[in-house]
Design a protein with these regions (language model features):
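Active-site neighborhoods and metal-handling regions in enzymes and metal-associated proteins
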Residues: 1-262
Length: 262
């Protein structure tokens, strides 16, 4: 069932979205060689709790951390570890969720650790740009397939592949709600977008094959050919007679990264 949010609900959803955005901005300060992914997780959890919120991901279906941290060929759902140390040339996707006042926020950003190859940087830029292509289609009266089509076409035209098994989703009192928001689609297909819908759009785009494999831990999803993947995500609200409202933000990341912001 698709739940339409009221204006009162959106007040709380904005707050949760901004907590997530600021948590990612806090993490951005520590994205550098020598830092463990477990430390990044601790930093984010401390910030989220300092806001009177709780991490959405911690213990969600048994997930053992507050962040999903996915390094290089890991597409999504990487588990932070004290043994996993960032090094020059890595790319690291940080996916963050926070729950406050009964509503979730959800966002992800893929960071560069130092300098990366030009082809990897281009993958990150294209993936982020495709997120905004999807958001541009998130208009009242459009359909979910219009979002997926926009993301898919933008990335495939540039030679990248789109992960199909992992999708965006509705967001609200539950972290994952209807409808699913695939990153592929046909124009004019799928559920119709209505004012009050709140959804997370999250392109997961690969440099090589679109095929993925699940690790034995039951969480970590990698590219089958071990080439890099990128992941960017915003939570947005469908508004009446206008464009979508982005409830999360990359502004705090940009403040930290400056000219290294993608």
């Amino acid at each position: 069932m698709i739940y339409l949010k009221t204006e009162d609900d959106l007040v709380y959803l904005r707050e949760s979205g901004q907590i997530v955005a600021k948590a990612l901005g806090t993490v951005a300060e520590f994205i550098k060689p020598g830092i463990t992914t477990k430390y990044l997780d601790q930093i984010a959890e401390e910030y989220i709790r300092s806001c009177g919120a709780v991490p959405s991901f911690l213990n969600y279906s048994g997930f053992p951390a507050s962040l999903c941290i996915s390094l290089n060929d890991v597409v999504v759902h990487g588990i932070p570890s004290k043994d996993q140390v960032l090094k020059e040339g890595d790319v690291v996707s940080v996916d963050c969720g926070a729950l406050k006042n009964g509503f979730h926020g959800d966002s992800a950003y893929t960071f560069r650790v130092g300098d990366v190859s030009k082809e990897t940087e281009a993958l990150l830029r294209t993936t982020k740009e495709s997120l905004y292509q999807g958001i541009a289609q998130s208009l009242e009266g459009k359909r979910v397939g219009d979002i997926g089509y926009a993301v898919q076409e933008y990335c495939q035209r540039r030679g990248y592949t789109v992960v199909r098994e992992m999708v965006g989703h509705g967001v609200g009192r539950n972290l994952h709600e209807d409808p699913e928001i695939p990153n592929v689609g046909k124009r004019g297909s799928g559920p119709q977008l209505k004012a009050g819908m709140v959804i997370a759009i999250e392109p997961m785009i690969n440099l090589g094959t679109r095929n993925i494999v699940m690790e034995r831990d039951g969480w970590t999803v990698r590219t089958a050919d071990h080439k890099p993947s990128a992941h960017f995500e915003h939570t947005i609200a469908i508004r009446k007679n206008g464009g979508a409202e982005i409830l999360t933000s990359f502004d705090y990341i940009q403040e930290v990264l400056g000219d290294r912001f993608i």
